[in-house]
Amino acid sequence: MVQTPVKPLTLDEFLKQPETKPASEYGDGQITQKPMPQGKRSILQRELTFALTVDFKPDKIAQAFPELRCTFGGKSIVPDIAVFIADRIPRDQNGQVSNSFLCHPNWTIEILSPGRSQTKVLRNIFHCLEHGTAMGWLLDPEESCVFVSDSPQSVQMFEQPEMILPVPTFANRVQLTVGEIFGWLTE
């Protein structure tokens, strides 16, 4: 019996599909589902989103969005935290935050989950950087380290607890150390 190959979905066809839980991402004709959030990732995502919001909100500099679908450059990804500076946040006709973000974040933050490919996550970060994102972080809770990149050609690893992590220039009020971030897992 001859099997007809299944035609891969286009990005537009993917976006018309119902959302999945956990979220699915699209790139290069492939759909991949993110792993189900687990304890460490959930705590880091919650606490980091809160910490960023505390720093951003007084001056309305930016907003941190957990699990926000960002579609740009032929891909549709869902960073664990997507940060947008205030004037780049899409708005609807009523001036409210749009439900659809057809643009790259200014800062993308991913948290490595058990069983998730570090390469796949880095590809998403590099895709963001190639399309205008200022910085990407990859938190590895099992190794208590943070990989920081401001271009696909440059990745730095931070693992000393007292190390203050670099941030994009718009976020210069944010002063977080490796120890503070991974300390949230023991609270």
Model-derived features: where do they sit?
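Gly/Pro/Ser/Thr-rich low-complexity, intrinsically disordered segments predominantly at protein N-termini
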Residues: 1-187
